Every structure is written in structure tokens, then in C-alpha cells.
């Protein structure tokens, strides 16, 4: 099922790189240590220097700016600039970071072209948004469905073959803007449902109603599927449908 790939992890944090090269992880997740140990035995390496390869996967933070109410893609742009300093002609850059729709067109493409690269020939751009949640990262990495957005079906299918080597979920190939939008829609849908759950819980508490009983009854409707996925305290509920 798993096709072996040669992998090199890159990070500017020298202490982190040293820790990983020593065979140690820096946080705990179910199944992570076992997976990491297997990767170490298979030859994974970590460095602060970008390497020459045919494919780069960029997974960096995209913080939310509460003042502009926009996602800041500066770390993505910086990472791609570093890649362009070393990558061979025809390399593919896959951005896994969550970005706003239009980020690849409005921020990434201009930078690539300004550096003299012809997109689709010198460098291929792909967006394959991650779909994992802390606490269940390993399972979701292996089993969640994935979306790959590319400028051409050929490149999309090429990248898909890399993901098939570890992802057991369905992998859909589409265009980049659609891939950007699907991740934002997924996150927004979840956020809206959490907000709805909190409001529903507030109303139920105010009127001394049992929210669990209400959800149970509502779920008897063929087009309703409400699920309590997390209760951190009596005043907060997380709900998805």
C-alpha cells in the first residue's frame, strides 16, 4: 500500500532540527511516535537548508490578522522564495497551508514570475490543503479525503501519486482556486455549527431544557444530523451537522 519516498524536512529552527535528527518528537499525538520511528528507520532527514528535489511541500503558518480580518500568507511567500533559490527546473511546489481563495493567484504567482520563473514550465504550483485536527492528526493524515488543486490535470495526477503513497482516503484533483475555496468552506461550516451549538446551549440552559434530549429528538428527522463532538464546560458545546 505504501510506496517509499525519500523525504527531507526543512525548518529554520536549528534546535528543532537537531531534536528530530536525534529521533525525538516535540509533541504527543496518538500513533505519532510509531510513525516517526518508522520514518527515521526509512531514512528521513531534517535540515535548516533547502534541498534540490522534484517536489516541495510547504506547510507553514498562515496567521489571521484580526485588524484586517485577512489571512496573512507572508510565510508561504517567504518559503516559496527560498525554494526558488535552489529548486531545479520543472520542480513542483505544493502548498498545504490554509489560505484565502485567490492567494495563489494574487500573492504566489506574481512572486514566482517576478523571479523569472515561467509557471507551468520552470515551476509548477499546486494547492493541497491539509485536513487534520490536533489530537487526531495521524489518523486523519492517513484516512481523510484530500483535495489537490493544480493548473493542469497532468501535474495534479502526478502529485496525487505522492499522496496515494500514504493517504487511504479519496483524493480529488481540481483547479487551484477550487481547492482554496473548499478548505475555507469546510472551516466556515464547522465554525458556523459551533456557534449555532453554543447559542442553542445558551437558550436551553436559560429555559432549563435538556439539550441532549432535544438533539436526540431532532436527529430523528431524516434530514437532520446533529452531533455533539466536544463539551469543554457546561456553557460551551461544539456541534456539527
Please describe what each predicted stretch is.
Residues 1-2, 229-241:
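Single conserved hydrophobic/aromatic residue that forms the stacking wall/gate
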Residues 6, 10-55, 59-70, 111-115:
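Conserved N-terminal Rossmann-fold NAD(P) cofactor-binding segment
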Residues 60-62, 98, 152:
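Short glycine-/small-residue-rich Rossmann-like dinucleotide-binding loops
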Residues 110-128, 132-226:
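Internal alpha-helical scaffold of NAD(P)-dependent oxidoreductase catalytic cores
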